């Protein structure tokens, strides 16, 4: 029934069916479809008959079969089947060539379409026999055509991407069903199926269909062409074509496989019939083949050989593959696809370097489509991939099994980065080499690699492939862009809300306030400033009033509104300060003052009773001092501008805080970007269940600032900069809102930090329901509880009411023990930022201030009395105990043991200055009243070296213990928690990075910084501390704490002291890191009851990383055991001079006026022996070699040591005398002296570890005229507050463990002993005026080799740039380096630097312009201790082996955003790129040409010139190069270059015309980045024309950029731009990839070699074949007429030569007679070819002529030799000489026409060239142009020497036709040889050929004509 219906349908046709040919025509080849009927199987489909819906084609073709059937509903079918793709497309209609929008739905083997997606009736098309193709090369309208046996649809998509999606969907719909239906198998099926890939095209000549063999219709022969094999078909015949496209794998070769006897497979030819190129020549018969009349002859798809049908059997079986043989993957080599989706490859014989090609079809205005098709025609289609459709992964997976292959990326830089990222993913760096073909616009990488800026023509692609085959390899550095972004969460529960109208009004107010703030910061107009300021105040007042009306009961909101008023008041103050100098007394000042008066807050006054009366929000004296300092700044205007910017940001943030609190559901830009609020960080449990304390007040419970909550997101627990040894003096206040970072330098003051020990009031609910207020102090140091009066409490105090849980709360708070009532220590110096934070904690404190002062006085008097008693007790020590000790006059200085954070040995002492243990106190935390000192103790303290020297050490250790530790053989190292049996798991960090980073840090700017920071503790101590004292206020503890010199502070002195607990249970003694660990790991009561376990020490086993045998240090037992031990540190004090005034307290005012203290050390060994006489013998191991021997030279070293001071150190000049002495007990005396002084002395070398964030110490000679702040010294400078320690806790730069044992060897002891004479005899003079540099010298003196010391590394010390003492004005070693420099300058002034010297330059290399006054002053360089380490790196690093990868944990919290190959930009350049990207996405048709894109870039750059959207970028970002902060001028962008090409070919770094002594030459394979400043769009434009260099910033190996504020900043990487939110960006080296660079020298060499080989082969072929045109039509035996003419001339020449040679011999009998015999032999041979006067005929003549030619050539050679040898003595007649010369010349010409060849039968035959003899050369020369003659200096009257005319033109002018033919064949134009031979074209005619002449010769191809004319031009010019 179905067949009957089909036949019936076949009869029903359209009225236009008459135009249709017979349905069976052309279907004979389609019988393989399986159809029984001769007619096609046509399914029942429904087609619309609307007049405007009828289909049409672009050519006149027969109408497909039309079916008139009732349309049925397809709703059920559509709902059942799975939809592959659906959407709207434009359908081309027949009427008026219109497009109609239709909805298409694609399913398996079916396509449905209707007017709308909701229609129930869809037209359906069967896709079982489908053909689809694109409708154009460029595909401007993104159209494609679908052809089935019954339908033909032309569809158009909105974009090329959508069109390719539809084509891919059609491919999927028609692909056979497979078990694994992923995209890989679909793409694999497409590669291996050998199906044609059609596209519509036109042809310039008659073309014939390969299916029906008929001509394509139309004048232009419009039809379909396969983009791979160039098969031509009609559109109606496309579905009938067989799948015989170009082979891809061995399976596709099929029956054509040829296998040899040995089993190897030969690559056969793959023939395609007809449509041959013009002038195709048969490879067998060398005749023209192909036709324009019919489909005939064959061409190979691989080697491009063409043959006749008759000559094809004679063709060689094996295919040579063609000119690109080296790059082609033969299909016979690809056997199958293995299980890992890669080819199983059998490498072919010979050279083989497969080429994997990736083409971006969208690049270059879709020019990539042409290249994609061209590559598929030249190579194996399976090795060419479209990046748009398949991406790089498919090709890389298939090529995975190739040992080595090349990759060619035809696209821009973005696609190159895509491919390189996929190579990273597959880890294929070692097996592939990447080349780039420039398509599109972004081709900076291709330009640098030598491949040019564009490649638009695909006609020379074979030659281009040869260039890539001869390319060389270079390594390209690739850089990871690591990003850490700030979290932007949404509040969980909304607090309040306002109506929609009020919300709109609120938004408008905030926008208006921001607008006015921007005007205030940026404008320079006074009137605008006044109006903006007044409007801002009005807007803020209106905002506060409206919000307060709707939220009257919200007390916190009222506080925030008051804070907003305070911030506005501070902004007005800053405005007044800025303008008071230039506008004193004008309207602006008056306006601002009136606004200040009006803006005074109201709420704080009403709630003043809630606040601590000590807390003040008024401007303090220090603020005025800072203001005065800013006035004296050399960068006054920029500093004031920055201050104003900070104040404006503060006001802006306060506005956002108010809005956020009133409306938590606002947009994200109004929300503070905090992952968790500070108040939610930690809930202190007060009940057994661990729940938070009930609180009736809105005040939340504040956690201790030193404790990291386990609820804090770990993604934020990272340091601001993990880079080592980094200095940060200026961080914008809104960088991280939850972290108080250092303010800019103008506002950086230790009194302004929020990280202070704050007084909080804990509100608890008592047992009877009453409210209990408990006040506590939070601190980083301390472990005991205190009562309301500040007294120390025992664990069971508080009336016994405290439960264990409450004690746990007290433990978590870790309050400090104070000797005074609780008051705010920063009462007079707290700024408004701190006021905001401390408001909630202190608002209900109402202690009486006068009462606190009285208690303070009482406690001070009591302390002084106890100290006097201690001093008297010390004075009673027997003198026998200290017989030979030093004469000591020190107030309250004790002999302290090796502290817990000191690890010492015979060669090195490591001091952890970050460790804040119970036995170590910072330099000022005992001064409770000193605001700056207390803050420094809690945050990052900045102190001088002298304060470090005299730091107090609690519960000390004896000198013997120190010496024991020095000489102990069991050196240990800090065991990581994961390897220790006594510790719990810690976050995986180690101190190794600290030391390793310090050792690797460059100190090019050595000794330029002068501050050392004690940062948050991270190094855990191994010392368990002294025995537990009774839990009461200990006078001895107080005295130990206070009887200790401290650094003086400029603020008013306070006598209150803050002591620390010395309990064993105090977790602080084990370091802050362990507290963090314990808090994070104790979440229930059971864990809280467990005893804490801390990091122990483990033995270092050589050859291993960390030993597993952990144990405590031996000094514990030595310290505790024995009655002979020294009883207390007080008893270790030295006898004092009776005349000296000993102070019982350490009041700094008294210390500053104290008299000098003289310390004399005469006998070191005796001193050590007497000091340690009471200790156990086995604990003393001295280094003395001669105990009773005095110093060898008898000289002393006198050092004047001044106590530290925050004042400038240049007020009193130091007097230092260094007298070298030598003794064996150097180290002993060094440690003894330092121990008695409480000094942490260095034993030959000392490591003082400090945080990577800390500003560190360096020695610098300050200028008197400079302010201390501009010299980099500010004792109140801040770095990071303790809250930021949460980041440091997970930072490997702050907490890494180092294997100390790996640093020390036994040989180091000997070296240290030899070099440790620096403190043999030392006199310390402590005078009233302090200077910290001399104390520094006293410490590092053992490190300094004296000039007369014979050390092997002395030259290294003098020559190294990173030497500690070079360039220092303190140590006086500059003369060594200066002498060397002078010597080098005299010796090698004109010598260039060697590559080794360039390689030895230390990075980062920073532009000296950074030091100029117009750049901001920012202290750079590493710390003092790190520079000491670098100076002695040879000793320290002798046995160091890295314990881990330093980058493993450096990037905690970071993620890789992308990878940089070319350049990175932030600011204006990224903004321009982002705008261009948006423009291109919006209007792609406007950005399709390279010239238009350049215009768009110019327009967008000019727009930025006016708008300046990236103005003041230096205020929004911070730049660090290799860990060093770089000060930034006013700029709009920063560019980081990896290649010397930027945004379209600009050499933005600038080329150096001379040898650059500062920077290294830029290169993309040196692991170095170039950092450049962008000042504006004008500079970017000028850099294309001018070689700019002043904008260079630095060269470095890593870069970090901190984005401040809350706004996004445009960023671009390799031209791809986006908006980056605030956070941190790190650029680190990722890997290197092999890139192919163009090698022009190799190309020229190969070209010349190929030409020689070609000419040689052509000459051989020419000798083996006849050169005359007649030879092709006649046999070799017959002499032609022209040859006969040449033969007669030859006979005449031979006869003449024989005649005159014989006459010469006869005339001169003395000559050789053998020449006469040769002449006779030649005469006889000549007679033999014409016996009896008749020439021989037939083949014998050519055989006889061989003998004649040989004899005549011998006669010619012998005659020439004779005349050359005897010509000077031979006297000839004039006529004989002339005739003999003419005969020889004629003979030479005739011999050139002769050739002897060996024939097939083995006989030699002679042949003659029938061409005319060479004519005389044209001696005329074209006159040179006038300017050439003028430059050469020749004039008309001068005789100019003319060289011999042997140039190419003269040689070509003498060419014969044979040589012209050879010249044609070298240019691969052998098809014109016959034409040149027939027309007798010689060299002279060749040089005059024109375009018309070439056309007459048959050269009709335009390309051939141009090539010949260009070659002729080259011959003429050369």
Swiss-Prot record:
Residues 1-10 have a biased composition (Basic and acidic residues). SMART domains: C1, DAGKa, DAGKc, PH, SAM. It comes from the Eukaryota. Its main location: cytoplasm. A zinc finger (Phorbol-ester/DAG-type) spans 195-245, 268-319. Keywords: ATP-binding, Cytoplasm, Kinase, Metal-binding, Nucleotide-binding, Phosphoprotein, Repeat, Transferase, Zinc, Zinc-finger. Residues 1177-1189 have a biased composition (Polar residues). Residues 82-175 form the PH domain. CDD domains: C1_DGK_typeII_rpt1 (cd20800), C1_DGK_typeII_rpt2 (cd20852), PH_DGK_type2 (cd13274), SAM_DGK-delta-eta (cd09507). Residues 1-37, 783-805, 1017-1067, 1177-1212, 1380-1399 are annotated as: Disordered. InterPro entries: ATP-NAD_kinase_N, C1-like_sf, DGK, DGKD_4H, Diacylglycerol_kin_accessory, Diacylglycerol_kinase_cat_dom, NAD/diacylglycerol_kinase_sf, PE/DAG-bd. Its EC number is 2.7.1.107. One of its GO terms (biological process) is phospholipase C-activating G protein-coupled receptor signaling pathway. One of its GO terms (molecular function) is ATP binding. One of its GO terms (cellular component) is plasma membrane. It is found in: Cytoplasm. Belongs to the eukaryotic diacylglycerol kinase family. This is Diacylglycerol kinase eta. It comes from Drosophila erecta (Fruit fly).
């Amino acid at each position: 029934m179905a067949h009957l219906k089909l036949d019936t349908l076949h009869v029903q046709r359209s009225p236009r069916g008459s135009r249709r040919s017979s349905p069976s025509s052309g279907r004979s080849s389609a019988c393989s479809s399986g159809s029984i009927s001769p007619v096609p199987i046509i399914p029942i489909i429904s087609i619309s008959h609307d007049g405007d819906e009828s289909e049409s084609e672009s050519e006149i073709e027969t109408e497909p079969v039309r079916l008139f059937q009732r349309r049925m509903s397809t709703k059920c079918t559509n709902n059942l089947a799975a939809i592959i793709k659906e959407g709207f497309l434009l359908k081309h209609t027949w009427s008026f060539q219109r497009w109609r929008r239709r909805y298409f739905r694609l399913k398996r083997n079916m396509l449905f379409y209707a007017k709308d997606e909701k229609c129930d009736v869809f037209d359906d098309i069967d896709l079982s026999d489908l053909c689809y193709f694109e409708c154009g090369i460029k595909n401007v309208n993104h159209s494609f055509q679908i052809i089935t046996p019954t339908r033909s649809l032309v569809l158009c998509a909105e974009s090329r991407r959508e069109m390719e999606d539809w084509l891919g969907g059609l491919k999927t719909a028609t692909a056979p069903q497979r078990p694994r239906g992923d995209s890989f198998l679909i793409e694999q099926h497409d590669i291996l199926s050998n199906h044609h890939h059609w596209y519509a095209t036109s042809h310039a000549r008659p073309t014939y269909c390969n299916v029906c063999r008929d001509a394509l219709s139309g004048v232009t022969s419009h039809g379909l062409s396969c983009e791979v094999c160039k098969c031509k078909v009609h559109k109606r015949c496309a579905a009938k074509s067989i799948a015989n496209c170009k082979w891809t794998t061995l399976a596709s070769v099929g029956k054509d496989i040829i296998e040899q006897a040995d089993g190897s497979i030969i690559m056969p030819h793959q023939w395609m019939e007809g449509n041959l190129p013009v002038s195709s020549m048969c490879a067998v018969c060398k005749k023209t083949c192909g036709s324009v009349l019919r489909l005939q002859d064959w061409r190979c798809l691989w080697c491009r050989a063409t043959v006749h049908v008759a000559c094809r059997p004679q063709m060689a079986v094996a295919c040579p593959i063609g000119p690109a043989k080296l790059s082609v993957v033969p299909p016979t080599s690809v056997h199958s696809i293995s299980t890992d989706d890669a080819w199983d490859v059998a490498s072919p014989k010979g050279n083989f370097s497969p080429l994997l090609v990736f083409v971006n079809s969208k690049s270059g205005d879709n020019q990539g489509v042409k290249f994609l098709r061209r590559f598929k025609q030249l190579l194996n289609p399976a090795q060419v991939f479209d990046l748009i459709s398949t991406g790089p992964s498919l090709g890389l997976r298939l090529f995975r099994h190739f040992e080595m292959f090349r990759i060619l990326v035809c696209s821009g830089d973005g696609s190159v980065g895509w491919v390189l990222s996929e190579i990273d993913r597959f880890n294929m760096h070692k097996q592939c080499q990447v080349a780039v073909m420039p398509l599109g616009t972004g081709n900076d990488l291709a330009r640098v690699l030598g491949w040019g800026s564009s490649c638009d023509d695909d006609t020379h692609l074979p030659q281009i492939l040869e260039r890539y085959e001869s390319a060389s390899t270079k390594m390209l550095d690739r850089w990871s862009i690591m990003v850490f972004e700030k979290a932007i969460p949404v509040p969980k529960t909304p607090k309040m809300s306002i109506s929609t109208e009020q919300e709109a009004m609120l938004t408008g107010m905030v926008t208006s306030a921001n607008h006015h703030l921007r005007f205030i910061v940026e404008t320079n107009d006074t009137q605008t400033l006044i109006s903006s300021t007044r409007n801002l105040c009005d807007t803020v007042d209106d905002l506060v009033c409206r919000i307060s009306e709707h939220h009257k009961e919200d007390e916190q909101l009222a506080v925030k509104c008051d804070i907003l008023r305070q911030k506005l008041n501070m902004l007005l103050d800053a405005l007044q300060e800025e303008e008071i100098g230039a506008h004193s007394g004008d309207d602006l000042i008056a306006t601002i003052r009136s606004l200040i008066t009006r803006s005074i807050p109201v709420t704080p006054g009403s709630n003043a009773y809630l606040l601590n009366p000590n807390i003040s929000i008024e401007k303090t004296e220090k603020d005025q001092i800072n203001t005065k300092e800013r006035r004296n700044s050399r960068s006054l205007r920029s500093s004031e501008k920055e201050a104003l910017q900070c104040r404006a940001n503060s006001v802006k943030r306060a506005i956002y805080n108010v809005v956020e609190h009133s409306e938590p559901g606002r947009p994200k830009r109004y929300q503070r970007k905090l992952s968790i609020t500070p108040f939610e960080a930690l809930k202190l449990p007060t009940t057994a269940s661990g729940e938070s304390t009930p609180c009736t007040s809105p005040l939340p419970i504040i956690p201790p600032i030193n404790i990291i909550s386990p609820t804090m997101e770990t993604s934020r627990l990272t340091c601001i900069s993990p880079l080592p040894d980094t200095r940060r003096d200026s961080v914008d206040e809104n960088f991280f809102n939850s972290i108080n970072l250092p303010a800019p330098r103008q506002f950086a003051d230790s009194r302004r930090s929020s990280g202070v020990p704050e007084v909080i009031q804990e509100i608890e609910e008592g047992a009877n329901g009453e409210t209990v207020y408990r006040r506590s102090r939070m601190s980083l140091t301390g472990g005991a509880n205190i009562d309301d009066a500040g007294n120390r409490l025992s664990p069971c105090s508080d009336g016994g009411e405290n439960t264990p849980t409450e004690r746990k709360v007290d433990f978590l708070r870790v309050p400090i023990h104070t000797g005074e009532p609780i008051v705010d220590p920063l009462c007079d110096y707290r700024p408004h930022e701190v006021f905001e934070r401390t408001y909630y904690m202190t608002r209900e404190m109402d202690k009486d201030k006068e009462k606190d002062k009285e208690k303070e006085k009482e406690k001070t008097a009591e302390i002084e009395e106890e100290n006097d008693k201690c001093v008297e007790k010390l004075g009673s020590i027997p003198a026998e105990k200290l017989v030979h000790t030093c004469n000591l006059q020190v107030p309250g200085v004790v002999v302290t043991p090796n502290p817990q954070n000191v690890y010492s040995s015979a060669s090195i002492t490591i001091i952890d200055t970050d460790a804040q243990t119970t036995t170590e106190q910072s330099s000022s935390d005992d001064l409770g009243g000193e605001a700056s000192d207390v803050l420094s103790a809690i945050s990052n303290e900045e102190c001088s070296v002298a304060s470090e020297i005299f730091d107090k050490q609690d519960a000390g250790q004896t000198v013997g213990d120190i010496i024991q530790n020095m000489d102990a053989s069991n050196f240990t190292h800090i065991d990581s928690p994961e390897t220790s049996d006594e510790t719990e798991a810690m976050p995986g960090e180690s101190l190794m990075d600290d030391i390793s980073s310090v050792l690797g840090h460059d100190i090019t700017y050595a000794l330029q910084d002068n501050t050392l920071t004690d940062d948050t503790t991270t190094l855990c101590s191994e010392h368990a501390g002294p025995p537990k004292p009774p839990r009461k206020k200990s006078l001895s503890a107080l005295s130990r704490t206070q009887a200790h010199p401290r650094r003086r502070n400029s603020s008013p002195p306070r006598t209150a002291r803050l002591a620390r607990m010395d309990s064993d249970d105090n977790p602080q003694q084990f370091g802050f890191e362990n507290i963090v660990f314990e808090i994070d790991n104790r979440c229930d009561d059971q864990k809280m009851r467990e005893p804490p376990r801390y990091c122990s020490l483990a033995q270092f086993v050589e050859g291993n990383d960390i030993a597993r045998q952990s144990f405590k240090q031996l000094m514990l037992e030595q310290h505790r055991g024995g009655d002979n031990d020294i009883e207390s540190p007080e008893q270790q004090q030295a006898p004092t001079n009776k005349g000296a005034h000993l102070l019982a307290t350490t009041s700094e005012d008294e210390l500053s006026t104290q008299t000098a203290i003289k310390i004399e050390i005469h006998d070191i060994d005796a001193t050590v022996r007497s000091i340690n006489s009471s200790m156990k013998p086995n604990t003393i191991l001295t280094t003395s070699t001669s105990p009773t021997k005095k110093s060898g030279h008898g000289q002393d070293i006198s050092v004047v040591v001044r106590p530290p001071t925050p004042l400038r150190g240049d007020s009193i000049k130091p007097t230092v005398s260094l007298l070298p002495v030598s003794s064996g007990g150097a180290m002993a005396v060094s440690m003894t002296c330092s121990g008695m002084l409480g000094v942490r002395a260095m034993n030959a070398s000392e490591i003082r570890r400090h945080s990577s964030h800390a500003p560190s110490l360096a020695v610098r000679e300050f200028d008197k005229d400079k302010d201390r702040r501009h010299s980099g010294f500010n004792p109140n400078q801040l770095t990071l507050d303790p809250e930021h320690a949460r980041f440091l806790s997970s930072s490997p730069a702050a907490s890494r463990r180092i294997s100390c044992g790996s640093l020390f060897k036994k040989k180091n002891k000997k070296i240290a002993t030899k070099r440790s004479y620096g403190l043999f005899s030392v006199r310390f003079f402590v005078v009233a005026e302090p200077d910290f540099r001399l104390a520094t010298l006293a410490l590092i003196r053992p490190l300094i080799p004296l000039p007369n010391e014979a050390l092997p590394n002395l030259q290294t010390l003098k020559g190294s740039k990173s030497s500690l003492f070079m360039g220092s004005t303190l140590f006086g070693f500059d003369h060594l380096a200066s002498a060397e420099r002078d010597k080098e300058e005299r010796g090698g002034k004109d010598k260039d630097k060697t590559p080794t010297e360039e390689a030895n330059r230390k990075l980062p290399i920073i532009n000296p312009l950074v030091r100029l006054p117009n750049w901001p002053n920012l202290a750079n360089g590493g710390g003092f201790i790190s520079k000491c380490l670098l100076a002695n790196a040879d000793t320290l690093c002798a046995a160091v082996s890295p314990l881990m990868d330093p980058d493993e944990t450096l990037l905690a919290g970071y993620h890789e955003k992308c990878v940089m190959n070319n350049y990175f930009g932030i600011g204006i350049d990224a903004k321009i790129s982002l705008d261009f990207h948006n423009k291109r996405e919006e209007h792609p048709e406007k950005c399709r040409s390279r010239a238009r894109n350049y215009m768009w870039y110019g327009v967008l750059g000019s727009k930025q010139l006016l708008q300046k959207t990236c103005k003041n970028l230096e205020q929004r970002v911070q730049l660090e190069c290799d860990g060093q902060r770089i000060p930034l001028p006013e700029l709009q962008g920063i560019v980081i270059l990896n290649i010397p090409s930027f945004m379209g070919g600009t050499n933005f770094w600038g080329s150096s015309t001379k040898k650059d002594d500062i920077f290294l030459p830029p290169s993309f394979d040196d692991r170095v980045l170039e950092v450049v400043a962008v000042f504006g769009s004008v500079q970017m434009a000028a850099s294309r024309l001018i070689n700019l260099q002043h904008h260079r910033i630095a060269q470095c190996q890593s870069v970090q950029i901190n984005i401040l504020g809350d706004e996004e900043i445009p960023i671009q990487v390799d031209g791809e731009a986006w908006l980056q939110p605030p956070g941190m960006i790190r650029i680190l080296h990722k890997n290197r990839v092999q890139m192919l660079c163009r090698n022009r020298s190799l190309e020229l060499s190969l070209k010349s070699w190929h030409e020689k080989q070609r000419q040689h082969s052509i000459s051989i072929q020419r000798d083996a074949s006849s050169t005359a045109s007649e030879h092709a039509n006649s046999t070799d035996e017959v002499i032609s007429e022209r040859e006969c003419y040449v033969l007669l001339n030859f006979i005449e020449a031979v006869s003449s030569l024989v005649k005159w040679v014989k006459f010469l011999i006869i005339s001169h009998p003395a000559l050789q007679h053998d020449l006469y015999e040769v002449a006779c032999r030649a005469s006889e041979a000549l007679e033999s070819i014409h016996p009896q006067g008749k020439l021989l005929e037939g083949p014998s003549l050519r055989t006889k002529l061989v003998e004649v030619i040989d004899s005549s050539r011998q006669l010619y050679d012998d005659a020439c030799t004779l005349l050359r040898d005897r010509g000077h003595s031979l006297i000839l007649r004039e006529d004989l000489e002339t005739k003999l010369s003419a005969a020889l010349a004629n003979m030479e010409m005739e011999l050139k026409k002769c050739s002897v060849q060996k024939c097939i039968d083995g006989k030699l035959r002679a042949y003659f060239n029938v061409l005319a003899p060479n004519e005389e050369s044209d001696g005329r020369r074209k006159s040179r142009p006038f300017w050439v003659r003028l430059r050469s200096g020749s004039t008309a009257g001068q005789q100019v020497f003319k060289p011999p005319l042997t140039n190419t033109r003269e040689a070509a002018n003498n060419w014969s036709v044979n040589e012209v033919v050879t010249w044609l064949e070298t240019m691969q134009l052998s098809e014109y040889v016959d034409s040149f031979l027939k027309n007798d074209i010689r060299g002279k005619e060749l040089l005059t050929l024109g375009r018309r002449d070439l056309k007459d010769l048959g050269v009709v191809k335009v390309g051939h004509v141009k090539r010949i004319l260009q070659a002729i031009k080259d011959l003429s010019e050369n």
